[in-house]
């Protein structure tokens, strides 16, 4: 009797296979990094072949570490770095070009040309996203325009597109020998090509971008049996697909309207469940699909993306040498009582949500002779909390929903000083769950739900447990005084790049 659910978590820097029991505990996992390819400034690529090879390797590794075989697994789910774009030959499985990664900015000119008629928000009413290099549509267009023979092959139906979820699902289910060509609604919602209301490809946008519809995968729910795995997981249903931030929402069991989670990594991503209602953003957030389970209606979310949070701690370590490991930032910050009156706004490459200002650059303001490295470390941590507050304010403004608590995950949630200050500056409790691997867990949940391993979302919610809660300890007057200072500091970053 199979008693575990598996997840393949294909991230920006590494690939993992993680196996969970019915209570949502990690039984075993394996992880491997892959190469980051930088052919030119601003260009970032991955080898799709290497990613598929790593995926097979971590599946083998995880099964072996747990002493398990395919017959022990009820279903496998996939979660992935979103927006990263692959175009490959349907007959051979060979990519026509490397995967163009979400951070890659080569499509800047394509985006500017598209924005010349109708502005940056030209497609936002239909797709919920601004025109930006971040999303897949312009990346597909670049490959069709720049790889010899790619456009003709796409029109003939010989080459196909997929994000990483689609590429892995196709290979897992047989590749050139009957592989299933699908993507789920969450990944499709990051292409700029899917209409958020119909949950189908938008022919008008495809026409404007010059992308043949026949190269696109079929859009499917996030939880259903898409096909059966071959190879290491032979016979196991492939039954769940979610983009990484959406998978974290499911892993955190944010199933009710108004529930939110914030993932603290290199940058930070906050998502708020808005239910079956599409909420357009007037405050610089993205409207996206949160999940769709089987034939139930799609659930939507607002997303706030922050470019630099954890990366600022790395900067303190690598560029200034004030600490030798990221974990030391907490002890350094705790040498002082407060920030000594300074604010650090990390607009190293402009500001993301809610400003979207590419002309901004980083500043440290309020310096006096009194300030020391402890104050600097504290200001670095506080910058993460202030940026999160700005996104939260934008979410409350757009949705009309008042947040009562924030669920958190990611690497920085083990920093108590930061998490306490986060609760203080938001004025709501901040909650860290027992199982921190929320992204992988979300993919396993989606797959297990499709085959009845978990019968409903209530069973998943029952698995979710609190590891630690930080409650606000700051009075309202102090909170607002500090936040006013931050808002003033942010204005000092504008209009720097001419």
Curated annotation (Swiss-Prot):
Pathway: Polyol metabolism; glycerol degradation via glycerol kinase pathway; sn-glycerol 3-phosphate from glycerol: step 1/1. Inhibited by fructose 1,6-bisphosphate (FBP). Keywords: ATP-binding, Glycerol metabolism, Kinase, Nucleotide-binding, Transferase. It is an enzyme of class 2 (transferase). ADP binds at residues 12, 16, 266, 310, 411, 415. The keyword ATP-binding applies. This is Glycerol kinase. InterPro entries: ATPase_NBD, Carb_kinase_FGGY, Carb_kinase_FGGY_CS, FGGY_C, FGGY_N, Glycerol_kin. One of its GO terms (molecular function) is ATP binding. ATP binds at residues 12-14, 266, 310, 314, 411. One of its GO terms (biological process) is glycerol metabolic process. One of its GO terms (cellular component) is cytosol. Key enzyme in the regulation of glycerol uptake and metabolism. Catalyzes the phosphorylation of glycerol to yield sn-glycerol 3-phosphate. HAMAP family: Glycerol_kin. Sn-glycerol 3-phosphate binds at residues 12, 82-83, 134, 244.
